[in-house]
Amino acid sequence: MAALEPEQLDTYFALMESVSLLHHAVEQQVRAAGELSYVQFQLLARLADAPDRQLTMTALADGVVYSRSGLTHQAGLLEKAGLITRATSPDDQRATLVTITRAGLDRVAAILPGHVDVVRDLLFDPLSKKDLDVLGGIMGRVRDHMRAQPPRSVSTRKRRA
């Protein structure tokens, strides 16, 4: 397999460093404002935006690109904190339905203004409208290409020999 071209390598490292810096800043803000990890905040934010403020565990795992076991652990922590509830889906006994509680909605509302400020400051303020349009188009194509692969929540585990 051929090595990456220098411009590909530069782009890859710039992307990874930018994502890492943004993720670190967002993680710090979410912890300071809401005493949650970024993954926990993502789960609550997705539930807050979902129809009827609920999703199945599988939909949550696919939406946040997180393993089933990791999601089960995070959901347990959020449920213990009173931020979500979990119940068997009335439509499919095999599915677990996750619903955000009033306390969960309040926590998202407390975190969101600072979260928006961090994202705007670090990601969007340095970009022109044209830059934003170009970046959005590129990242949308890359995301769609990656999402065309089977979601991790349905991937089978590889057995060790």
Residue ranges and their predicted role:
Residues 1-34, 81:
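N-terminal leader segment of winged-helix/HTH proteins
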Residues 57, 75-76:
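Short, hydrophobic-biased segments on the C-terminal half of alpha helices
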Residues 1-4, 129-161:
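C-terminal regulatory/oligomerization modules of transcriptional regulators
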